[in-house]
Amino acid sequence: MKITALASAILAVVHGALALPARAPALDITLSQVNNTRIKAVVKNSGSEKITFVHLNFFNDPSPVKKVSLYRNATEVEFTGIKQRLRSDGLSNEALTTLAPGATYEDEFDIASTANLTQGGPVTVRTQGFVPIAMNNKIAGYIPYSSNELELEVDAVKAVAVPASIKPLDRRTKITSSCTGDRAAVLNTALRNAASIAGKAANAASSGSSALFAEYFKSTSGNIRSAVAARLKAVASEASLNGGGSTTYYCSDPYGYCDSNVLAYTLPSTNEVVNCELFYTLQEVTNDCHGQDQATTIIHEFTHAPGVYPPGTEDLGYGYSAATALSANNALNNADSYALFANAVYLNCQGQTGGQTMWDGNSQPGQTAPGTQTMWDGNSQPGQTEPGTQTMWDGNSQPGQTEPGTQTMWDGNSQPGQTEPGTQTMWDGNSQPGQTEPCTQTMWDGSSEPGQTEPDAHTTWGNFYQA
């Protein structure tokens, strides 16, 4: 199956067009006013495939999280609810929502419960960002969401009558009486580790690897490097003060917003940080690139607190794939970007994933097959090509087998995984499997007829942004 250079070029262009899904996965949010400050959000799966996502820190979360942004005269109204850090694996089913293509669900909430709207008058409401998708109860990637812009005329008298979601507590001490015994020891160690790791990350932001910095903050400009370094330096300083700084720290939950999926949360409006029970199950410091631990959880939470470094950050992209998909300006305002960068500096993670962290199919999805570019998505049709490699599914056995350093495929006549050296041997679907299609990259595409040629390209299919 030989083709000319011109045909190869034409097919490569066609491949580039076909590689994108017909309807990229996304959630569309329609906001409407129920009455005064009470809002209804209709969440719709606008993509072409069923998706499962984490609805914590999103619509359907019963906690007072930031679901929308509010603006008065183009200035954002201060949010007075909580910002949570979630576990990345072992998520409970109750934290997940599954939507078929075109399916919707609704969530109603009162924006006056998490913002001071007693002034009344015109307020603009909108939201956008990324929501984590999940597979096997683990965060495996992300999809974007965005809403319409809703204009309200707030009745101040009615807004005053809405109770605040967070009741003020006595905060006379910086590290509260909940931090005693073993929990005090855990917190003190975590603060020391956070101070050390954040300090190293601040130095790396100022004068370290530009490639590593750009991986997380999408820029190497001096202004952005200085801004990141300044925030991380402030986080390191806050952690080193061990209770003498701007935050108030709780070793247990005084407000009742922890659950089995939340590591910790911050109340930015009062600079309070709360550890949940799950925090104490984390390692002090992880050995895994982009893993979660106690130290980087504190870094994440301290970036939310404006008393540490104003303004506090948001949760715009959660996890490595979402955080590294943000623009430079959004990454500057994203808590997980700082925690992930600090982890990467500490463990020297540059190049270990290259942004190609995929499913391995043998354990939890989202793991990287170390030392190779062998990846599986475990979720779609066999024959998909993962970018940067020519390693593919065979569709007949278990995913996760590695064919390193070759274009090794199943030949169908003997044991799977045999190597056809010196060729790009694939299934052609028309005769016996294992035939050789020399001088081309002939492969299954999983969506049409087998045996199509995708010359001089890595054919990529898949309707999710992979983790």
From Swiss-Prot:
Locations listed in the record: Secreted
Q: Which residues form a coiled coil?
A: none
Cite a single GO BP annotation.
Answer: proteolysis
Keywords recorded for this protein, A-Z: Cleavage on pair of basic residues, Disulfide bond, Hydrolase, Metal-binding, Metalloprotease, Protease, Secreted, Signal, Zinc, Zymogen
Alphabetized InterPro entries for the sequence: Fungal_M35_metalloproteases, Lys_MEP, MetalloPept_cat_dom_sf, Peptidase_M35
Q: What EC designation does it have?
A: 3.4.24.39
Q: Which residues form the propeptide?
A: 20-172
Report the cofactor remark: Binds 1 zinc ion per subunit.
Q: Which residues bind Zn(2+)?
A: 300, 304, 315
Task: Provide the catalytic activity annotation.
Answer: Preferential cleavage of bonds with hydrophobic residues in P1'. Also 3-Asn-|-Gln-4 and 8-Gly-|-Ser-9 bonds in insulin B chain
Q: Mind telling me which Gene3D superfamilies this protein's record contains?
A: 2.60.40.2970, Collagenase (Catalytic Domain)
Cross-referenced Pfam families:
Peptidase_M35 (PF02102)
Q: What is the role of this chain?
A: Secreted metalloproteinase that allows assimilation of proteinaceous substrates. Shows high activities on basic nuclear substrates such as histone and protamine.
Q: Which family does it belong to?
A: Belongs to the peptidase M35 family.
Protein name in the entry: Neutral protease 2 homolog NFIA_031120
